[in-house]
Structures are given as structure tokens and as C-alpha cells.
Amino acid sequence: MGVAGCDPGGAESPPAPIDPLDMGSDEDVGSGDMGPTPVELHGQLAVVGAELRDEHGERMQLKGPSSMWLNWENEGFAQNLEALRWMRNNWRATVIRAAMGVEPDGAYLTNPDKARSQVEQIVDNAIAAGVYVIIDWHDHNAHQHKDQAVQFFSEMATKYGDKPNVIYEPFNEPLDLDWQGTLKPYHEAVIAAIRAKDPDNVIVLGTPNWSQDVDRAAESPVAGTNLLYTLHFYACTHTDWLRGKADGARAKGLPLLVTEWGATHADGGTDGQVCLDAARLWHEWMNTHGIGWTAWKLDNCGQDSSCILAPNAPVTGGWTSTYLKGHGVFVRARMQDE
């Protein structure tokens, strides 16, 4: 099996075989219960310094997939409990991200009941499967929808605030907005609503410029406990310069979570390319610092190389290499890494 690659600058390179270490394993142990779940093992998460830790004080590196924008998720991969249990058992997934679209037609602003129901299905499944779950307000203009976000996260915290599985993500990818004057006040308002109902579950805060400018957030972090900051990368586009920003933020004590990444260009890989060499550098960096992640995206779309699944993938799991496409085998291998 081979893939076409590209250098970090985006130039195409000839197809090359995938390193076996980047393939992962097709071994299938099913979706049944197999001993302690991730949440049973690690319990309540907390942010200590620049690290996420479990209830035993050990560094916790979450790994799992992000859903597609749920308003465009036709197959229901992320909402299937058997598939989630299967990923937990076979890919060692410890987290899933529920990317609830906000602005597009049919998303939260125009169909809130459907959007909330989709998120709650994923959260309920995560609780049943014993994995962590990120409730993502998947919006580029959340500062314009602050009242709706405050209400939504207050409802989520009321319903799920006593569950250690839950992580809140109130702003997916802000545009190039002012941190101090716009984003920070937005986060403070949503945090206050969550903390009124849930005093301790982790909240991850979106950062300026498509959640890349973590260095700007590090200049004036939000006050509070158990707060992480979002970093997003797409390996063909974002290289050592973005890791430099992240290193600078971490040096100032800013704890990070990569809630979205791909071994593709930043457009999600519409050209079908993957950049595995560049992606490996990112994973070496995340592993060194214990930074957790969710990979974009658990979907079976056609051309985009950020789609993990092939068009013929079954909804309930059992995804051998035959059912993976784009960066899918690489994502699987990185989840299966010890």
C-alpha cells in the first residue's frame, strides 16, 4: 500500500510505501468489555502546570478521533456506541471529540434540538464506553454567539458536570481576533457559566488565528483552574515555525491540547495529499511533552485526505486497513502507540 506525499512546503513528491510503523495493526479483538476502561483507570483529569494529569498525578496524553461537523455527518460514525467501543479496544482510543457545528444551515443556531441531541448521544456513549469526550462548540465566530454558547455550556455542565469523562471546548477555531479584547472575555463568560455547575472538569480554550497563536494567549492567560489551550496543526502547512510558537507558550507555562490535526494541508487535504514525514515530527513533539490530541476526522468522505475512513466503511467499526484512507492508517498507528 502506498500514498502520495508532499514536502512541508506543499510540493508533491512521488508515491512511497508507508513505513510499517505508520500502518498500525489490523488485529481485531471486537467491541466487548475488556477490563478497566480509560476513565476507570485514570478518573478525574486535572491541569497541573503545563500538563494534563490523571487522578493519580500521572501525565495523561489523550488520543482519539474528532467527529466530522455533526451537521454534515450523514453516516453517524461518531454517534455509534459499538464503533466507539471498538476504537477503544483496537485503536486504544481514550477520547472522542463531538464537533457540533454552530453557524451552517442545519447546525446549532438553526436546529438546536438536533445538534444538542447529536452531542448528547456521543457524550452518553463515551460515558457508557468509559472514554473521555470533548464537547466542541465548532464555530469560527463564537464571540458573536456568546449568549447561545453560555446557555449551551450551562446546560451541558448541568447535565454532565458530575461525569469525569467530560471536557468542554467553547471555541473551536477563532479567526484572527484580538485575544485580550475579544477572545479572553468570551472565554471568561463561558467558563463562569460552566463553573457555576461544574467546578472541576477540564475546559480547553480556543486561541487566535485558527487556534495557532498560542503565544498570544500565553501573554495573558485566563484566570482559573483546569484550563487548557487549543493548538491545531495540519502537517503539510504547519511546520517548525508553529512548534516554535507552541514551545514559547509552554515555556511560559501554557498547557496545550491539540483538538484537531491532520497529516494534510490546512484545507483538510482536498488535494488528496498527506505529509507523513512532517506529521511524524509533530507526533514526536507531542509525545515528548505529553500533549494529547484528537485527529480530524472520523468520516468517510471521498477526496479529502483528512477523512480517516473509506466510503465503504461500516458504521459499527471493524475498520481494517481496507476501510481506511488518506491519513487513516497513520492516525490509527499513532493511537496504537504505547
Language model features with spans:
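Substrate-binding cleft and catalytic face of glycoside hydrolase catalytic domains
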Residues: 74, 84-160, 164-176
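N-terminal carbohydrate-binding accessory modules
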Residues: 22-95, 318, 324, 329-337
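Cys/His-rich zinc-coordinating "finger/knuckle" motifs
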Residues: 12-14, 72, 167
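Acidic active-site catalytic centers that drive phospho-/nucleotidyl reactions
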Residues: 54, 136, 260
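Ser/Thr-rich, Pro/Gly/Ala-heavy low-complexity intrinsically disordered linkers and tails
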Residues: 1-37
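Extracellular glycoside hydrolase catalytic/binding regions
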Residues: 43-45, 69, 76, 94, ...
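Surface-exposed charge patches
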Residues: 55, 86, 124, 247, ...
